[in-house]
Structure formats: C-alpha cells, structure tokens
Design a protein with these regions (language model features):
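Loop/turn-to-beta-strand initiation segments
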Residues: 70-74, 112-115
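Anionic group-transfer/hydrolysis microenvironments
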Residues: 8, 78-80, 120
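A glycine- and Lys/Arg-enriched "phosphate-lid" helix/loop adjacent to the NTP-binding pocket
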Residues: 86, 90-153
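Conserved substrate/cofactor phosphate-moiety recognition/catalytic segment
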Residues: 11, 15-72
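Hydrophobic anchor at the beta1->P-loop junction of P-loop NTPases
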Residues: 5
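Walker A (P-loop) ATP-phosphate-binding motif of ABC ATPase nucleotide-binding domains
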Residues: 2
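Conserved protein kinase catalytic core
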Residues: 12-13, 83, 126
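Conserved P-loop NTPase "ATPase switch" module shared by AAA+ and STAND
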Residues: 71-84
C-alpha cells in the first residue's frame, strides 16, 4: 500500500505520518517512510528540472515495481504534487510534467492501493507555526505566496 502526504510546510504532515506509523506498528504492518524534497545546490533551473524528471521517473518506477505490490506500507512524505506546486513558483519551470510521468509509469497501477492526503489550513496559522518551528525550510513566509501554494495543492 502507498500513502502520500503532501502539502505546504508546517501543516502537520510529519505529525500525521507519525500517527499512521504508530497505528500500523500496532497492527504488525511494516512501514517504510520515503521523504522527497527539492534538489538543492544547482543554480540552473533547467538542470534542476532535468534531475527532477529523472527523480520522479525513479519514484514512480519504484512505486509501481516495489511499493504497490508489497504487503508493507510505503509512506511518501512529499511527492509529485510538491514538484507541481513549487516548480512554477520558485524554480521557473512548469511542474505539470509529473502528471504525464505518473500516467505513463503508473497507468496500470492507479486503481490499486494508492492514497493521497493533501492538507489545507488557514495560511496565517501555517505561517505562524512555521515561524515558531524556525527551521527555515519553507520557500516563503509571505501570505500571498502561501495562499497561492495552498490553492495549488487543492
């Protein structure tokens, strides 16, 4: 089974994942957590996009060949929705390609055990939590950008 948690930073994905893992362990289910993030260290957005395409090809192939057929629980902390949302906003390229990859690679698997949770909350509360967390991981603490991010995750 595959469960994907995706949304903006500081919305509670990690908290929900921890709760799911605890429940799975109570039931004797083996869990694997895969955490994906943007590619760091490259200045050229075209190079980032090229590497991202390869990364998502690999993610979807692994999902199809290993995660979906397994009896284990594979939890993705971020996946392709983040690429779709953040690419045009912060990396200046269209992230819609992830849906074409998803459709091509997972075409026979999309009706299987794949569940997606995308969390939405009040943007002011998210920014407040993000500031309290203070890890500097969010792309932006700007209210208008946060609203745009949330709209794209819907």
């Amino acid at each position: 089974m595959v469960v994907i948690f995706d949304s903006v930073d500081a919305i509670g994905k990690d908290t929900q994942i921890e709760k799911l893992v605890q429940e799975a362990h109570k039931r004797g289910i083996i869990t694997h957590i895969l955490h994906y993030s943007n590619i760091k260290g490259l200045k050229d957005n075209n190079a980032v996009r090229d590497l991202s395409v390869k990364q998502y090809q690999s993610i979807f192939t692994f999902m199809k060949d290993v995660a979906i057929p397994s009896k284990d629980l594979f939890i993705y902390n971020r996946a392709h929705l983040s690429e779709y949302v953040y690419s045009p906003m912060y990396r200046n390229y269209d992230g819609y390609y992830v849906f074409a990859l998803e459709k091509t690679i997972l075409k026979d698997s999309l009706s299987k055990d794949i569940y997606l949770f995308s969390f939405i909350d009040n943007p002011e509360k998210i920014i407040e939590r993000d500031k309290e967390r203070g890890d500097g991981q969010s792309f932006s603490l700007d209210l208008d950008k946060k609203k745009q991010e949330l709209d794209m995750f819907k």
